[in-house]
A protein has these predicted regions:
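ABC-family P-loop ATPase nucleotide-binding domains
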Residues: 13-69
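A short, surface-exposed alpha-helical micro-motif characterized by mixed small hydrophobic
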Residues: 123-125
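Conserved H-loop
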Residues: 111-119
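Helical segment within the ABC ATPase nucleotide-binding domain
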Residues: 96-109
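ABC ATPase "signature
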Residues: 141-142
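Catalytic Walker B motif of ABC-type/P-loop ATPase nucleotide-binding domains
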Residues: 82-86, 91
Length: 164
């Protein structure tokens, strides 16, 4: 990925890229310096929504709190494409709901979101198109409602059946 791609893509990796000595406030300043499309007011609003202490170091935060901060940062960019790699793995079910609610309520409908996850049941209600992959190869893709209708099961049921 080059500078052009990074200019319109907001990426959440499956592992943190933030230094443990950063605070949410410092991370917001860092993102503001790096990304011209970053909305710091939106980031602070999300930090408040997630009830994150703005001046606590990441090293003193739980995994769920760090995950929420990363989501706040990437969703505070005015990007055209959002890539979220396992955004809710490793956090408890209550935190998953909060994270997904924040993502959906703050998502620009003019943008595209690609979300990779093994937690299909948790994201099924927000998925419009599903792509099932194995060993780096696509083996099934389609409109989520059409897949449910065709296979007479949920996306989670389809996922579980295909990956046995």
């Amino acid at each position: 990925p080059g500078a052009e791609t990074k200019a319109f893509t907001s990426y959440l990796p499956d592992s943190s890229l933030l230094a443990d000595n950063l605070t949410p406030r410092a991370a917001i300043r860092q993102y503001q310096d790096f990304f011209t499309d970053f909305d710091s007011a939106k980031a602070y609003e999300m930090v408040d929504f997630f009830r994150l202490p703005a001046d606590r170091k990441l090293s003193a935060m739980s995994k769920g709190m760090r995950e929420k901060l990363q989501v706040a940062l990437i969703m505070s960019r005015n990007a055209h494409v959002y890539l979220l790699d396992e955004p809710i793995s490793g956090v408890d079910p209550a935190a998953r709901d909060v994270i997904l609610r924040a993502v959906i309520s703050r998502f620009n409908p003019q943008a595209v979101m690609l979300l990779s996850t093994h937690l299909i049941n948790d994201v099924e209600s927000i998925v419009s198109t599903a792509v099932f992959m194995s060993a780096g190869q696509v083996f099934l893709t389609g409109d989520a409602d059409q897949l449910r209708s065709t296979y007479q099961t949920s996306l989670d049921g389809l996922f579980r059946g295909m990956y046995r």
